[in-house]
Structure formats: structure tokens, C-alpha cells
Amino acid sequence: MDAEWKPGCPEWTTENGSQIAEQKRLRVLERLVRKDYTKPPSAELVKSWHKEMFQGIAPHSDYVGQFRDKDLTSYCLQDYEVVVGDIPGTDSSRVLLEVEAFFKDFNERLNILESSFPSGSVRPPTLNEVSEIIKLAAWAHGEWVRIHPFANGNGRTARLLANYVLVRFGFGPALAIRPRPDQPYGKAARASMKEGDHSLMEAVIWRLLAESYK
């Protein structure tokens, strides 16, 4: 990932304390599986995951638990633009608007799905319902990486969002937070970010979910 760095704002391309970072990721995933899946999806929820994962790990406190923005008081995130390969994330001037629209859409999609298959249902989902659950997980993941709201750690939070959907509807967290899943996942994430096409990610989640039950 490339980014525009300001004077006094350290580049965030590596993590300090890999063992500590792994412990933090596991705590966040455990928290999601234990209680967070019952909460409505929101910017504050995802910010709290990011903060718990990266507090003391990111090279500058401005980067932790805050979205890129044009008018932030956090100097290092003002006008902060990201590019993954040759694909730019959402312009910093539009990040907050797109994040707000994302969670509005996410909650609407979740409510529609729960109207036919409520989370916590005692019956198993039909094949069509499983397909809809996976579509929602892939959509949430793909839209998050398309926006790329954070300075770094967007893929990890996208995988947490996909796992959030799966766990909410009775499945296990099929997407590893770190290391990143295999190359088909990378290709699918790129298609989501560049083209808004989440169909490849749907196929990846189907496979990872099936493998998690072997």
C-alpha cells in the first residue's frame, strides 16, 4: 500500500511487536465472537476494533481508530490518501460520507436478511439463505476495502466485518485476520476495490467457510 506521508508523520508499512500484534488480533476476534456480533454494525464498533488491534502498534497515535478525513484535527490523517497497487481508495474528502452511507446500507441489508432468517434462529438456514449470508459478508468486506477508510489495517477490519456477518448467523469466523488468506482472496479483494465486483469474494468465502468445517 502506498500513501502520501506528511513531515513528522511516520510511514506505516510495518508493525512493531509482531507477537503483541497477534495477541491483539486474537482478542478482537474473540470479542467479536463472544459479544460484538449481537451489536448493530456501526462506525464506532469498527473504530473500536481498529483501536484495540493497533494501539501501541501503529507508528503514530493519529492512525489508530480514526478514519482518513480532509478536516480532521489529527494532523497526520488530514488529506491522507491511500493507493493499493494502482487502485486509489476513496478520496479523503469523501471518506466520512461514504462510511456513513456504508453503515446505513449495511443495516438495511442486514434487516432484510434477518426478516427471513433471524440471527439466533434455532433452525438451520436453507441453501438460499446461506447464499444470501455469504453475499452480505462479501459485500461488507468488498465495500470496506473499496473505501479504505483507515490509514492502514483496512483488510483486517474488512475480514472482521465479513466474520461479523458469518458469526451473527451462526457460522464460525472463516476468514483469518492475519496472515491474509491465499491468492484467490487477494484477486477477489482487488476486484471489489477496483470494479465494485464482489462475486469473486463470494466464491472465496464459500470455499473458506466449507474448509473451516472440514
Regions found by a protein language model. Give the residues of each.
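FIC/Doc superfamily catalytic core
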Residues: 1-214
